[in-house]
From Swiss-Prot:
This is Putative pterin-4-alpha-carbinolamine dehydratase. HAMAP family: Pterin_4_alpha (MF_00434). One of its GO terms (biological process) is tetrahydrobiopterin biosynthetic process. It catalyses: (4aS,6R)-4a-hydroxy-L-erythro-5,6,7,8-tetrahydrobiopterin = (6R)-L-erythro-6,7-dihydrobiopterin + H2O. Keywords: Lyase. NCBIfam families: PRK00823.1-1 (NF002016). It comes from Azotobacter vinelandii (strain DJ / ATCC BAA-1303).
Length: 118
């Protein structure tokens, strides 16, 4: 369990600062299996989780959704047979905030507990 996975999101405003390059470098080391993607100039965190079947992938999607609702911070989720792609970024600031790294770490913790993962 990481420090990030024990943290909670803070309310984010449209004028909240994006993570700096140094913060990005420090935070990504705490979630090494996540990739930083640049989509139309917007940095995002992304990871693909593998499962044995669609039912397990869907259950994980539901668990991530429940976590997102509890924290008030929501990812893009793509659920397919045997896999779920999770993408975190902060829509209000069109980039990465510390909240995204917290949620990525907490998503990893959910995955560790997912039953019958491939």
């Amino acid at each position: 369990m990481t420090v990030l996975s024990q943290a909670h999101c803070e309310a984010c405003r449209a004028d909240a600062p994006k993570v700096s390059e140094q913060e990005l470098a420090d935070l990504i080391r705490q979630i090494p299996d996540w990739r930083v993607e640049n989509r139309d100039g917007i940095l995002q965190l992304e990871k693909v989780f593998a499962f044995r079947n669609f039912a397990r992938a869907l259950a994980f999607t539901d668990a991530v959704g429940a976590l997102a609702e509890a924290e008030g911070h929501h990812p893009a989720l793509l659920t397919e047979w045997g896999r779920v792609t999770v993408t975190w970024w902060t829509h209000k600031i069109r980039g990465l905030h510390r909240n995204d790294f917290i949620m990525a770490a907490r998503t990893d913790e959910l995955a560790k507990g997912a039953e019958d993962r491939a």
